[in-house]
């Protein structure tokens, strides 16, 4: 278990992380979302003991990261957003050296594990190719494979599928899930909403260095002005009778801009015929009706201070 207890990190006069409290459960995949500069990378580097928190406390399996940095470091593997691989070495040697530094495996065990992970990501044939000659996607695979081969207790991935094509993205998600299923706790920082939703057990949203929301993707969508949005186009010049929708407990908010009316709902799909009937009986001329589900992107924009369109 990983715990952030009112943790903060300041660089000069800049508070990169502020009063941050969160618990990450064992053997879960936590997706970390936030705008650029929100503090996601700083959080991960504090967890990995690269940065020391300037306030509060961070613990990993009950150990304070400041008091027990070496013990914590042995449990964590980090795949960085920008691949940190020695360009002179080939992929095989990069991974073999990484395992030598981070595990107690013997030479045969290391080589066996490296071969398995390189074959899994379709890099075996390029195992001796110097990484500086590789494409960005191939280098990113090598970076991710360092953690996949290490199989740490806590695995941290910063934008794990950046530069990857669609088949490679799907494969990387599968391998990250398998890492979790093997007993690792996984943290994935990403700017891709589909990645966060399809990969994560829970999603944490960070904004301006603070935790603003954390829950399962479905629960987050359900909390964002209901799980669905009903968009109506009514006759020009009509004042929308909001009060007639007060009878429906599922209606959470109503807004109108000219002849465009937006109704935020929970359980709106089953409620739609009743709402249309009620409005028609009140003399509202409805020109069009569109029901859409709130997406994780909507949730993200809402929690980071952007207006949903």
Predicted regions and their residues:
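ABC transporter nucleotide-binding domain
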Residues: 175-266
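Conserved ABC ATPase signature
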Residues: 130-137
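Catalytic Walker B motif of ABC-type/P-loop ATPase nucleotide-binding domains
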Residues: 155-158
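Conserved ABC ATPase "signature" region
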Residues: 96, 100, 108-126
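Helix-to-loop junction immediately C-terminal to a conserved catalytic motif
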Residues: 48
């Amino acid at each position: 278990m990983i715990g952030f207890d009112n943790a903060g990190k300041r660089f000069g006069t800049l508070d990169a992380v502020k009063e941050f409290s969160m618990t990450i459960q064992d053997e879960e995949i936590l997706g970390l979302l936030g705008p650029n500069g929100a503090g996601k990378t700083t959080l991960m580097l504090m967890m990995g003991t690269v940065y020391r928190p300037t306030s509060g406390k961070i613990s990993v399996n009950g150990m304070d990261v400041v008091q027990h940095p070496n013990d914590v470091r042995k449990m964590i593997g980090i795949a960085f957003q920008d691949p940190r691989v020695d360009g002179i070495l080939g992929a095989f040697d990069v991974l073999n050296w990484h395992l030598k530094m981070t595990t107690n495996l013997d030479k045969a065990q290391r080589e066996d594990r490296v071969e398995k992970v390189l074959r899994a990501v379709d890099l075996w044939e390029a195992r001796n190719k110097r990484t500086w000659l590789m494409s960005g996607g191939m280098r990113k695979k090598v970076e991710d494979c360092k953690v996949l081969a290490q199989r740490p207790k806590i695995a941290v991935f910063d934008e794990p599928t950046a530069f990857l094509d669609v088949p490679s993205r799907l494969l990387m998600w599968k391998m990250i899930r398998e890492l979790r299923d093997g007993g690792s706790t996984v943290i994935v920082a990403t700017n891709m909403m589909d990645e966060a939703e399809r990969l994560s057990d829970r999603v944490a949203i960070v904004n301006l260095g603070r935790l603003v929301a954390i829950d399962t993707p479905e629960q987050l969508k359900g909390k964002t002005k209901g799980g669905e949005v009903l968009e109506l186009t009514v006759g020009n010049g009509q004042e929308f009778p909001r009060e007639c929708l007060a009878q429906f407990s599922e209606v959470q908010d109503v807004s109108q801009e000219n002849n465009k009316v937006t109704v935020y709902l929970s359980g709106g799909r089953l409620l739609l015929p009743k709402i249309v009937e009620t409005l028609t009986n009140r003399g509202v001329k409805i020109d069009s009706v569109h029901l859409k589900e709130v997406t994780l992107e909507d949730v993200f924009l809402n929690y980071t201070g952007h207006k949903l369109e």
